[in-house]
Amino acid sequence: MKTGITINGKPVEVPSSFDELTFGQFLRLKESETDAETMCVLTSIELEVCKNIAPELMNVIIAPASDLGEVVYLNKPTVLGKDVPDNLGKMEYARKVNCDNLSRNYKDEEMVCRMVAIYMAEGIDDEDIEATYSLILNESFTNVVSAGKLISEQLKKMAESEAKIPAPQYESAELQAGIKNFSKYGVWGVVRGIALRHGCKMEDVYSWSYNTVLLELKYSAEENSFQRRLNRIMNKPK
């Protein structure tokens, strides 16, 4: 990282690989529009100082960051000194819900970082997640995107498990009455239904493990299918 250059008596260091680049620096680099802004991000030197650096010296300083190479994904990345969870299904359902909602407000690398924050945070409250996100911005870019890759792979498998749950086979009368309109309530409707079944608060359901909620959904689907088959048998014309 050392460039052999000193400014105001301090050695200038510039990341020369993704391992040396923090995630926060990466996000800020994407927004940089001038060489001075790029230098400010890479060196943490004040922007006003960077603006007064001679162009030829500026080029020498930011050159190492022009080719950071390829990202080498780690098999066992660590974030904030902790291993990435290898069984997201055992963690709170709220984390999965929060990840599913990320695409509404974020995209690309920022969405990856927030996804990692959701699963690395100690708690599931927004304050815990935001505090963790702020800390992760100072983590190695390589570690964060590697963690994001592992989490994404698990989330994909979880989504596949949900997709296997059979949809209810509604009767024509139910369809005419507009039963499918209830689907607009999404996760809120699902959690409300589980809470009513167990006589608990919706907040309690969000704190259950994802695996427990998934089992509830599977059970509910099978029970619903059974009740419909039974009703058809019982009401079969004689």
Show where each model-derived region lies:
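An amphipathic, hydrophobic-aromatic interaction surface with interspersed Lys/Arg
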Residues: 1-238
